[in-house]
């Protein structure tokens, strides 16, 4: 009986040792560069392509819009935009990514927080008209807190570009045509 127990332990120990080893990319004690290299080495081309995809929450009018359905969402996608009002759904989607994807890579949740989230502030062009970077810092600080509390990881802002052509559709997201003012307001935003 004793020999059988020793044999069982000898067979079981190597198996337990292998099972307890985490992949390098999951080891927070390793340098980031090494973790990234390890993760990229493990990823298939398909997984890498899906990490570059951003699906949209809301209308279900094209294949990259999930509507309000989670079941058809690939677990390996990189990010999802416009989901900030339902923490249960966000957690369900994140759990799907972590548990159903092969490598357990979490999804980034993004939203356009260019001039506030729950509290809406004047557009960037109007903020620049105030010539008050401190006020911009205060407003953006509140927007940042609201974003964190809403589970948003990625805010797509500020938009630091110099407005050159008034026909451009996103000119209102700029801080204007003066590079110095754009720089000051951009620094205040960040």
Q: Across the structure, where does each feature detected by a protein language model lie?
A:
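N-terminal beta-rich core of secreted/periplasmic extracellular enzymes
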Residues: 21-190
């Amino acid at each position: 009986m004793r020999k059988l127990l020793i044999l069982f332990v000898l067979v079981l120990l190597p198996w337990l040792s292998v099972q307890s080893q985490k992949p390098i990319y999951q080891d927070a004690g390793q340098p980031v560069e090494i973790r990234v290299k390890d993760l990229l080495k493990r990823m298939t081309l398909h997984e890498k392509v899906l990490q570059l995809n951003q699906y949209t929450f809301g209308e279900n009018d094209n294949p990259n819009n999930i509507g309000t359905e989670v079941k058809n969402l690939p677990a390996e996608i990189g990010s999802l935009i416009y989901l900030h009002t339902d923490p249960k759904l966000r957690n369900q989607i994140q759990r799907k990514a972590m548990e159903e994807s092969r490598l357990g890579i979490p999804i980034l949740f993004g939203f356009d927080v260019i001039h506030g989230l729950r509290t809406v502030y004047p557009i960037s062009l109007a903020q620049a008209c105030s010539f008050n970077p401190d006020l911009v810092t205060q407003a953006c600080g509140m927007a940042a807190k609201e974003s964190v509390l809403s589970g948003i990881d990625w805010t797509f802002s500020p938009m630091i570009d110099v407005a050159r052509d008034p026909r451009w559709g996103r000119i209102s997201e700029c801080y204007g045509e003066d590079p110095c003012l754009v720089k000051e307001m951009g620094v205040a935003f960040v």
